[in-house]
């Protein structure tokens, strides 16, 4: 079995995020929204609702399960991959594309961004280093990305 993204090949099984380029604080992404909406959005966006310069990269492997593996290298050196903090379980691109629009005018969670348990992270040594990401499934399929950083969080960057 494979996860099949809508309108995208089954060869696309994960998405990577450069945390240095993500600040989903309501004051930044919806400055004109009502204060109650901003407060709720910041709580909802949790770990994405502030700026960071920690050189962390997050990898959302949608179909991750037993037998999968994630390897990341920076300049030929392996980086330690760990499970992301639960405050970073919501996919930041989904928050950016869908939830900002919703929370600008409402406090209801229409088309809510679900919390996921398949978000992983590594810490790079530099904000401009290129990472090689390799994700393998238990069936021998290998999915790769050369992640050039900085990698902005916007629709065009992630359009396939």
Outline where the language-model segments fall.
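Metal-dependent phosphoesterase/phosphodiesterase active-site architecture
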Residues: 1-160
């Amino acid at each position: 079995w494979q996860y099949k993204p809508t309108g995208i090949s089954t060869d696309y099984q994960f998405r990577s995020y450069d945390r240095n380029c993500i600040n989903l604080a309501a004051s930044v992404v919806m400055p004109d929204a009502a204060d109650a909406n901003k407060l709720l959005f910041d709580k909802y966006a949790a770990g994405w609702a502030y700026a960071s310069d920690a050189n962390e990269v997050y990898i959302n492997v949608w179909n991750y399960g037993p037998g999968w593996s994630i390897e990341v290298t920076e300049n030929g050196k392996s980086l330690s991959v760990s499970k992301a903090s639960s405050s970073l379980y919501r996919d930041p691109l989904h928050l950016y594309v869908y939830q900002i629009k919703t929370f600008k005018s409402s406090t209801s969670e229409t088309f809510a961004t679900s919390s996921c348990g398949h978000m992983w992270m590594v810490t790079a040594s530099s904000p401009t280093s290129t990472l090689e990401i390799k994700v393998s499934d238990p069936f021998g399929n290998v999915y790769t990305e050369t992640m050039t950083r900085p990698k902005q969080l916007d629709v065009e960057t992630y359009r396939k």
